[in-house]
């Protein structure tokens, strides 16, 4: 954990230093903002040790981001997502919510705008496991486990926009969410792919 925090600190420091250098060179500090919504899906997996159960499958969800542009390559803002892994075909699920501060670099290459960065924040994992019955009736279920855990979220990202125009982009990105808690956190992990529209101002 200490090594991860050190790496993140170095990344953010490098971003800030590069941003300041770029701003001085281009004589422009604030260069607008962008924001939009994205859908995502990805294959995730978690070993739920207290239940001796391995949860895996497609986790789908939605979310969005807003970022402010400084210099010619640096953005800082906030983003948040919710992602649900449905299990057992009976209403069981693992729902992950996370949000935080996003820092990234971007470059414009013709109609393309690749970017890479990291989001640091927090989230919550809500689990519902139905081992007897399902959610398709009004019967009381006798064997249901519900658990909710907060966590520190660290989410590296890489992606690319296709610039339809100066103000409208289609974005595709990939991430891998890491969660940290003092104990008993069984966060489904794996790569996620996102697609959405981003509007620039």
Predicted feature descriptions by range:
Residues 154-201:
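Predominantly the C-terminal beta-signal and adjacent terminal strand-loop region
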Residues 68-140, 152-154, 162-168, 198-201:
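Gram-negative (and chloroplast) outer-membrane scaffold detector with strong preference
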Residues 31-33, 56-62, 93-99, 112, ...:
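Residues that define the transmembrane beta-barrel architecture of outer-membrane proteins
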Residues 34-42, 79-81, 115-121, 173-175:
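Transmembrane beta-strands of outer-membrane beta-barrel proteins
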Residues 40-50, 81-90, 123-127, 177-183:
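Sequence/structural signature of outer-membrane beta-barrel proteins
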Residues 19-70, 74-76, 200:
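Short glycine/proline- and aromatic-enriched beta-strand/turn motifs that initiate or cap beta-hairpins
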Residues 26, 47-55, 88-92, 143-148, ...:
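Outer-membrane beta-barrel domain signature
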Residues 1-30:
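Cleavable N-terminal export/targeting peptides
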């Amino acid at each position: 954990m200490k090594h991860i925090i050190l790496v993140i600190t170095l990344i953010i420091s490098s971003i800030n230093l590069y941003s300041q250098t770029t701003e001085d060179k281009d004589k422009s500090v604030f260069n607008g903002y962008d924001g939009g919504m994205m859908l995502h899906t990805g294959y995730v997996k978690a070993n739920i040790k207290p239940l001796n159960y391995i949860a895996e499958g497609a986790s789908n969800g939605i979310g969005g981001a807003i970022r402010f542009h400084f210099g010619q390559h640096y953005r800082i803002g906030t983003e948040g997502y919710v992602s649900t892994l449905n299990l057992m075909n009976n209403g069981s699920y693992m729902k992950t919510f996370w949000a935080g501060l996003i820092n990234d670099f971007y470059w414009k290459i013709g109609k393309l705008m690749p970017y890479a960065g990291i989001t640091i924040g927090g989230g919550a994992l809500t689990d519902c496991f139905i081992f007897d019955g399902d959610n398709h009736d009004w019967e009381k279920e006798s064997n249901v486990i519900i658990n909710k855990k907060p966590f520190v979220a660290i989410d590296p990202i890489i992606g690319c926009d296709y610039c339809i125009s100066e103000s409208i982009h289609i974005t595709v990105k990939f991430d891998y969410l890491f969660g940290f808690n003092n104990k008993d956190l069984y966060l489904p992990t794996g790569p996620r792919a996102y697609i959405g529209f981003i509007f620039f101002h």
